[in-house]
């Protein structure tokens, strides 16, 4: 019986990782379990750093030491025992990929099945004449080769190995024994009687040289014989290399399988690699499968409205100023161009000569020496600089490849059709449309019985995977969407969909706030999807703050009671029904005892607006919108409705550019912003880390460390010893411990085991040398101060205003629990964002700042949201403007103004469907069809 109990539960004994206080917890298996609690209370530590880490460690330890050296190493978490643990998979908020070749389709493997479908039942069409492609006989091939240019020298090749791994000694020996003398190996001609060594782990291509011949009537029979031999050797394929004098040779592919007789072109047999943009077989030869190319941007090289002698040509005056400036002046003098004029004031001939050159020799002086050089034009000069590996990224733009129009594939691959659609059509349609297409069997009724039999299992896999994406609220995305542009919440839901598609059972899934980025409309969809994953026999542990998700859980674990040192305990575990009867913070917000309400501030007397005009980006078409200033404005709408496109991709970069050059207000990409005179800066506060190394911490980021170092340097003992403030920095020589160089830890490489961080035995983790630690303020050394929580430090430095005022802002944003010297890499995204807010609060404010935040409630408990709301409104009370992209109804209902985008995502979005106060948006929801308004109406009842 005892055994059964253990197997039905995961039992954690003595968990002490980070701030966890010797936790004992029993979690039921095969259920939907939610971990909740304040930000920094220890939820993620228990879920990810303890349960998942131990599950992963046990799996890796079961592998051989040889295999382990190639895998990420996972250390043992600080826990006495975990029983009943199953294999664990973590689905966190990290962006899926930074690789420009990753797309939604490749991540979910849907693209792999599409490639297979196109290779097996695709109909080939000629990309030139659009006629269907048919087979080519041996006599047709012979005729085409014989009609090549008279006296051309050609090599007829039989492809033996195509881009495969192996040493292929047997193949090479077989060719030699059958009388072949030469072969092309990886593009280089070799003699087969010589020793050839091929690396078995690398891909190789081997082509037998069947004959080398000159095109003329006398050699017709010889060509025919060679062609027949090559076709037989290579199962109906051959290559012809046409040699050219003083130019690279030309390759032509011929096949008995596929050809367009009208255009006299042969095509290779279709295979999945023909549709892979990561393979030379399928990738566009111009952009190499990226879909985009970097090229010089005239608008970045040249300012047409600035006089030529005042730096209008940025690329010339940006590098080697003297040389290019002298050459440019020589060109203008020779062509009679007045450099006091702007580019737009020159005539067409002068403009063309300036940009593209006119072949004239220009005389000029450089370093007191007379020089004569041809004027190549600004464009060519810029390209020459690029070849010299000078950084011209400031003058380049990423543009859609003109050859493949951004679709990444060769023309021959893009012309293949399935059910009347090309691959590009499937990649550019919203996933919702792709799902409905594959869910309609009539689209494939044209297939014969054999084709149906081949296509059926492939279509089933595609339909399932596309449905799972649609089901988690991602129907607005496209399969061709670049993975780098996907948010953390979207990438997590993609991986949830992929896991459902994998069909795994008996797995422990650990998820980090899957509701992030989801509108209330889609939350129930997500919960149903998670339920489907759980019903397959899996255990779900979800770190979450969303009310609906918590209420739908089978089992809730609340970590607290507070955060940091005041957290790390299980304050509740049990059913939702039991939770609602509890009297701690989470339960109080769920049962309605406590509510998040806006602080009382006087509304601004002056009413100013920021108006964005002519927005055309992604799914937004010709949009103009007014945003009130000196208010808390929420941008709302379902996922994919255009919120980020409008604010982060349009308003933010445009406003930053214009405010940086505030003398002249002009439009960028057609976008015009009216009302910027009411602002002096735009600040974007995201959830990116405040530092990427352990040397970054809240004290250094907020600037309080500078004041603390000055205070220590002002101590009598420090002055006697001549210590300056730099003595108390762990980043420079002098006061720091040199053994660990101010890290406090030393990393020991363990090869087959995880690297171990060992406390420095010289400074014992203090980061400073003993002489520095002898200097004390109120009996505390600099190391003692860095180990204090913000709350403790505020009390300690209460009589030092310059320090106390900065610490007070950290307290105001609810971060009293973090330590001053806490490693920046251990801070959550929500904590990092609030530290940035605290830094802004501590600055002397002009009251003319526009703050932009993207989902600031990510990772925040109801109590934390309350703190955040107070901070946002306090910044507005100072006369600043606050623009927040948000789905959280507690923030939305307490905003001054709402701009709701929609009505749906993707092509069905991109419009402002409702705007006004929260009450106005709620009252007009039936008229505007605003989903936000409908949920807001329920919330405001």
Regions found by a protein language model. Give the residues of each.
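Conserved phosphate-binding elements of NTP-dependent enzyme cores
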Residues: 1-941
């Amino acid at each position: 019986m005892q055994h059964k109990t253990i197997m039905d539960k995961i039992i954690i004994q003595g968990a002490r990782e980070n701030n966890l206080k010797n936790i004992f917890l029993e979690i039921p298996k095969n259920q939907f379990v939610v971990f909740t609690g304040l930000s920094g209370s220890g939820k993620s530590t228990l879920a990810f750093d303890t349960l998942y880490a131990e599950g992963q460690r046990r799996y890796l330890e079961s592998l051989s030491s040889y295999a382990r050296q190639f895998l990420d190493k996972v250390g043992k978490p600080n826990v006495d025992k975990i029983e009943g643990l199953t294999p664990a998979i973590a689905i966190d908020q990290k962006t899926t990929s930074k690789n420009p070749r990753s797309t939604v389709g490749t991540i979910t493997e849907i693209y792999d099945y599409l490639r297979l479908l196109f290779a097996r039942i695709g109909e080939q069409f000629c990309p030139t004449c659009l006629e269907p492609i048919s087979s080519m006989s041996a006599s047709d091939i012979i005729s085409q080769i014989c009609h090549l240019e008279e006296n051309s020298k050609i090599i007829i090749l039989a492809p033996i190995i195509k881009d495969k791994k192996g040493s292929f000694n047997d193949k090479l020996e077989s060719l030699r024994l059958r009388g072949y003398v030469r072969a092309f190996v990886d593009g280089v001609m070799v003699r087969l009687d010589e020793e050839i060594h091929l690396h078995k782990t690398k891909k190789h291509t081997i082509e037998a040289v069947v004959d080398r011949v000159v095109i003329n009537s006398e050699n017709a029979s010889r060509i025919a014989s060679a062609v027949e031999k090559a076709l037989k050797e290579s199962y109906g394929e051959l290559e012809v290399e046409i040699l050219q004098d003083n130019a690279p040779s030309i390759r032509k592919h011929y096949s008995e399988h596929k050809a367009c007789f009208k255009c006299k072109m042969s095509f290779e047999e279709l295979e999945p690699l023909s549709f892979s943009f990561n393979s030379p077989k399928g990738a566009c030869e111009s952009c190499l499968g990226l879909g985009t190319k970097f090229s010089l941007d005239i608008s970045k090289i040249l300012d047409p409205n600035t006089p030529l002698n005042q730096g209008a040509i940025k690329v010339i005056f940006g590098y080697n100023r003297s040389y290019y400036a002298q050459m440019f002046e020589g060109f203008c003098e020779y062509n009679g161009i007045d450099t006091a004029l702007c580019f737009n004031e020159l005539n067409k001939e002068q403009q063309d000569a300036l940009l593209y050159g006119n072949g004239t020799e220009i005389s000029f002086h450089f370093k007191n020496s007379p020089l004569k050089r041809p004027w190549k034009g600004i464009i060519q000069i810029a390209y020459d600089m690029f070849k010299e590996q000078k950084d011209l990224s400031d003058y380049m733009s990423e543009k859609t490849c003109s050859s493949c129009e951004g679709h990444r594939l060769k023309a021959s691959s893009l012309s293949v059709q399935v059910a009347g659609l090309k691959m590009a059509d499937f990649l550019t349609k919203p996933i919702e449309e792709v799902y409905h297409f594959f869910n309609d069997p009539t689209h494939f009724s044209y297939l014969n019985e054999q084709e149906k039999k081949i296509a059926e299992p492939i279509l089933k896999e595609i339909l399932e995977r596309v449905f799972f994406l649609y089901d988690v609220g991602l129907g607005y995305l496209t399969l061709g969407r670049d993975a780098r542009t996907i948010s953390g919440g979207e990438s997590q839901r993609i991986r949830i969909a992929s896991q459902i598609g994998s069909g795994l059972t008996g797995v422990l899934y650990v998820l980090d706030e899957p509701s992030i980025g989801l509108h209330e409309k889609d939350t129930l969809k997500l919960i149903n999807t998670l339920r489907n994953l759980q019903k397959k026999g899996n255990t779900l542990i979800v770190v979450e703050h969303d009310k609906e998700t918590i209420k739908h859980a089978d089992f809730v674990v609340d970590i607290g009671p507070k955060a940091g040192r005041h957290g790390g305990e299980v304050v509740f575990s049990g059913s939702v029904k039991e939770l609602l009867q509890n009297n701690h913070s989470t339960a109080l917000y769920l049962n309605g005892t406590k509510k998040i309400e806006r602080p009382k501030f006087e509304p601004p007397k002056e009413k100013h607006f920021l108006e964005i005009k002519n927005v055309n980006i992604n799914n937004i078409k010709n949009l103009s919108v007014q945003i009130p200033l000196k208010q808390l404005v929420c941008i709302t709408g379902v996922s994919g409705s255009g919120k980020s496109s409008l604010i982060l991709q349009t308003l933010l970069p445009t406003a930053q550019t214009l405010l940086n050059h505030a003398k002249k207000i002009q439009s960028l990409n057609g976008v015009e912003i009216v009302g910027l005179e009411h602002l002096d800066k735009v600040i974007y506060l995201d959830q990116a880390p405040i530092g990427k190394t352990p040397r970054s911490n809240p004290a250094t980021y907020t600037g309080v460390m500078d004041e603390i170092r000055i205070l220590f340097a002002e101590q009598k003992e420090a002055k006697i010893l001549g210590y300056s403030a730099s003595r108390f920095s762990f980043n420079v020589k002098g006061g720091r411990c040199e053994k660990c160089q101010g890290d406090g830890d030393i990393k020991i490489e363990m090869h087959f085991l995880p690297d171990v961080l060992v406390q420095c035995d010289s400074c014992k983790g203090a980061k400073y040398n003993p002489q520095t630690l002898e200097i004390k303020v109120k009996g505390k050394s600099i190391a003692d101060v860095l180990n204090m929580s913000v709350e403790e430090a505020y009390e300690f430095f209460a009589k030092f205003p310059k320090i106390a005022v900065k610490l007070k802002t950290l307290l105001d944003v609810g971060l009293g629990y973090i330590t001053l010297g806490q490693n920046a890499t251990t801070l959550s995204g929500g904590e990092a964002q609030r530290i940035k807010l605290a830094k802004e609060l501590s600055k002397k404010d002009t009251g003319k700042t526009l703050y932009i935040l993207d989902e600031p409630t990510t990772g925040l408990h109801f109590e934390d949201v309350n703190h955040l709301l107070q901070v946002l409104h306090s910044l507005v009370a100072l006369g600043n403007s606050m623009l927040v992209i948000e789905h959280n109804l507690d923030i939305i209902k307490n905003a001054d103004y709402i701009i709701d985008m929609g009505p749906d995502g993707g092509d069905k979005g991109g419009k402002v469907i409702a705007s006004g106060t929260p009450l106005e948006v709620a009252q007009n929801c039936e008229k505007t069809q605003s989903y936000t308004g409908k949920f807001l109406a329920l919330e405001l009842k």
